[in-house]
């Protein structure tokens, strides 16, 4: 045997399997060349990694079930059984289908608490619906040397917000295992992604007492494991224009609705960039500038017809002020551009617009951030006006909003596991703080 072949043979060493036997890899020492990993073996190892973890397996179970808004019933049933099997008393709170949908399937909020504790002091809450379309759950090993924490889990809802749901449940179970008397409740709602009717339903129900029986609410959304000290407000706007249809060869015989609406939309598009003094929307040091997104534009029937109608829908993320103040600024801007034309109509279709929402961040050990997206938080009316000590509201969760709703939605095992630690820290702080005095709930 030639010497160089002997040296090469002796230099081949198997890299020991890492992290409890997951992912078999082999390398040539001193070489960048790696033998290809058998795909079937890799898939089996990744699935075993998930199956061996209560957190990861719960997350996989609920992410594999499609739960687009208004079709949350199947994942709800799975969670009901999971929580009952682990000693929770679980209640269904039936929520009617949202307006404008054709769904007749039952769907519901989930209200769960330890036996004998129907009015828990600490509530962890998130949502079980997702945006469409459903994207199949999948596991992906990291490039290079295997690192368990870097295994990536992808699919719809893996971040927003089933990562929070799974982490909250596991954190609650761990605390109740160590102390069954901790007053923990779980609330998982539907339709967060399409207006928040699930949380509104809970807010209007007899479970939301006056004064509240709870002193802490921990909301779960993708926050990159930071504790959020607030998020922007939200206001929806629709603008409609009426014209007169005519043959495009004789446009002077009609009036273009699109031509009427375009300068108004141009003005709307800049309202967040100009000072209030010159007719713009307000900004703040904490949240930055108010942003305006013209989300949809519709109009016309064909390219050879002068358009009779045109419309646009707009989302405004408020950095300061109230929705009422923003509505007045928008009405004034539309009036100024249109000259008060009766062919233009402005509406604000959201029944519950809200200003910027400030949140609590008084628990040590977290990085602090603000976010631009909306949540269910303002949809839950808290009746603590007469209380000296107000209900605490925290917003925290695993994953980044930057991939939520997209084709590449995904989260690492490490971030998901860290979220359990984060929720546990928030629970510990709430238990330590306790309730300063007895409150009689009617």
From Swiss-Prot:
<dbReference type="InterPro" id="IPR050072">
    <property type="entry name" value="Peptidase_M20A"/>
</dbReference>
<keyword id="KW-0378">Hydrolase</keyword>
<dbReference type="GO" id="GO:0005576">
    <property type="term" value="C:extracellular region"/>
</dbReference>
<keyword id="KW-0645">Protease</keyword>
<dbReference type="GO" id="GO:0006508">
    <property type="term" value="P:proteolysis"/>
</dbReference>
<feature type="glycosylation site" description="N-linked (GlcNAc...) asparagine">
    <location>
        <position position="102"/>
    </location>
</feature>
<dbReference type="InterPro" id="IPR002933">
    <property type="entry name" value="Peptidase_M20"/>
</dbReference>
<keyword id="KW-0732">Signal</keyword>
<feature type="glycosylation site" description="N-linked (GlcNAc...) asparagine">
    <location>
        <position position="343"/>
    </location>
</feature>
<feature type="binding site">
    <location>
        <position position="160"/>
    </location>
    <ligand>
        <name>Zn(2+) 1</name>
    </ligand>
</feature>
<feature type="binding site">
    <location>
        <position position="160"/>
    </location>
    <ligand>
        <name>Zn(2+) 2</name>
    </ligand>
</feature>
<protein>
    <recommendedName>
        <fullName>Probable carboxypeptidase PABG_01461</fullName>
        <ecNumber>3.4.17.-</ecNumber>
    </recommendedName>
</protein>
<keyword id="KW-0479">Metal-binding</keyword>
<dbReference type="Pfam" id="PF01546">
    <property type="entry name" value="Peptidase_M20"/>
</dbReference>
<feature type="active site" description="Proton acceptor">
    <location>
        <position position="192"/>
    </location>
</feature>
<keyword id="KW-0325">Glycoprotein</keyword>
<dbReference type="Pfam" id="PF07687">
    <property type="entry name" value="M20_dimer"/>
</dbReference>
<keyword id="KW-0862">Zinc</keyword>
<keyword id="KW-0964">Secreted</keyword>
<comment type="similarity">
    <text>Belongs to the peptidase M20A family.</text>
</comment>
<dbReference type="GO" id="GO:0008233">
    <property type="term" value="F:peptidase activity"/>
</dbReference>
<dbReference type="InterPro" id="IPR011650">
    <property type="entry name" value="Peptidase_M20_dimer"/>
</dbReference>
<dbReference type="InterPro" id="IPR036264">
    <property type="entry name" value="Bact_exopeptidase_dim_dom"/>
</dbReference>
<feature type="binding site">
    <location>
        <position position="193"/>
    </location>
    <ligand>
        <name>Zn(2+) 1</name>
    </ligand>
</feature>
<dbReference type="GO" id="GO:0046872">
    <property type="term" value="F:metal ion binding"/>
</dbReference>
<feature type="signal peptide">
    <location>
        <begin position="1"/>
        <end position="20"/>
    </location>
</feature>
């Amino acid at each position: 045997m030639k010497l160089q072949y002997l040296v090469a043979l002796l230099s081949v060493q198997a890299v020991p399997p890492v992290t409890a036997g997951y992912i078999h890899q082999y390398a040539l020492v001193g070489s960048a060349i790696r033998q290809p990993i058998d795909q079937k073996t890799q898939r089996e190892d990744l699935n075993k990694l998930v199956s061996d973890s209560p957190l990861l397996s719960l997350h996989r179970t609920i992410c594999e079930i499609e739960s687009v808004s208004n079709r949350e019933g199947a994942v709800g049933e799975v969670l009901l059984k999971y929580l009952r099997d682990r000693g929770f008393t679980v209640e269904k709170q039936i929520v009617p289908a949202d307006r404008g949908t054709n769904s007749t399937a039952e769907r519901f909020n989930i209200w769960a608490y330890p036996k004998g504790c129907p009015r828990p002091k600490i509530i962890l809450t998130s949502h079980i619906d997702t945006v469409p379309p459903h994207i199949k759950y999948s596991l992906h090993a990291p490039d290079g040397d295997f690192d368990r924490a870097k295994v990536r889990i992808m699919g719809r809802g893996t971040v927003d917000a089933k990562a929070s749901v799974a982490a909250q449940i596991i954190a609650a179970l761990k605390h109740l295992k160590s102390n069954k008397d901790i007053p923990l409740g779980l609330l998982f709602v539907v339709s967060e992604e399409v207006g928040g009717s699930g949380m509104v339903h809970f807010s209007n129900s007899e479970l939301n007492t006056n004064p509240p029986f709870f002193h802490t609410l921990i909301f779960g959304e993708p926050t990159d494991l930071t504790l959020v000290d607030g998020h922007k407000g939200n206001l929806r706007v629709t603008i409609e224009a009426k014209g007169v249809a005519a043959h495009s060869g004789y446009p002077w015989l009609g009036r273009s609705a699109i031509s009427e609406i375009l300068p108004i939309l141009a003005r709307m598009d800049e309202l967040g960039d100009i000072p209030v003094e010159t007719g713009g929307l307000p900004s703040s040091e904490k949240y930055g500038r108010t942003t305006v997104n013209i989300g949809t534009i519709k109009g016309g029937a064909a390219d050879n017809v002068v358009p009779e109608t045109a419309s646009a829908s707009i989302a405004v993320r408020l950095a300061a002020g109230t929705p009422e103040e923003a509505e007045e600024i928008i009405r004034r801007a539309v009036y100024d551009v249109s000259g008060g034309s009766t062919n233009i109509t402005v509406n604000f279709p959201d029944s519950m617009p809200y200003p910027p929402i400030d949140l609590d961040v008084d628990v040590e050990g977290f990085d602090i951030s603000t976010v631009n997206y909306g949540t269910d938080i303002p949809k839950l009316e808290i009746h603590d006006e007469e209380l000296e000590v107000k209900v605490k509201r925290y917003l925290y969760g695993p994953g980044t909003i930057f991939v939520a709703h997209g084709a590449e939605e995904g989260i690492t095992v490490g971030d998901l596991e860290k979220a359990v630690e984060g929720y546990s820290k928030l629970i510990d702080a709430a238990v330590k703080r306790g309730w300063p005095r007895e409150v009689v709930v009617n």
